Amino acid sequence: VASILLTGFEPYGGRGINPAHETMRALDGRVIEGFTVVGRGLPVSLREVRSRLPQLIEDIKPSAVICLGLWPGEAAIRLERIGINVVDYEIPDNDGALVNDGAVASNGQEARLATLPLREIEAALLDQGTPARISSTAGTFLCNACLFTVLDVLAARAPQVPAGFIHLPYVPSQVAELIKAMRSEAALEFHQRADIASMELSRIVNAVETAIAVTLKGRVRA
């Protein structure tokens, strides 16, 4: 079956949900441009990212790969341009590991560029009235590690397969919880919080569906 692999990170950092995981689940099994979306959850773990992603690509043999993650405070659909071979955490991953000044892979490659049609995706989303932008940093946590790993694996095994990473905003319920916590802690004033932007999950799901459609449009099903 011609397919696209869509991954979404599980909740992390004490958060109850992750819009990336919810979006992946919403689109799993959907047929877009004749390709079936194969959704898979990813633990927020460097160990799991390194082991699971190559295996998923080997098992599914997708025609494209799009990975999803959360960027707290982001107000738009954020299309990542580049993955770098750096791991540097500010908080532990879900294994409890706290990595500083590490590498995603030991192959010496410093960075890899996403191969999704980023400008076309951005234009399609903006035409739909959905805020979107191309970003030149995916950070140095697991989202970047995911992007670099996928691009690294595909460069060696299937360089014709387009792949990339999309960062998503909070959903409104998450921001509501942040504000409640802020009120109860009384440690910060409201204007000091920089992470209170959000987007409805339905709009996020539609945006990712559009990104998939733009990526796959005109591609021949294997």
Where are the language model's segments positioned?
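N-terminal catalytic or cofactor-binding beta/alpha core of small enzyme domains
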Residues: V1-T140, L151-A156, Q160, H191-A222
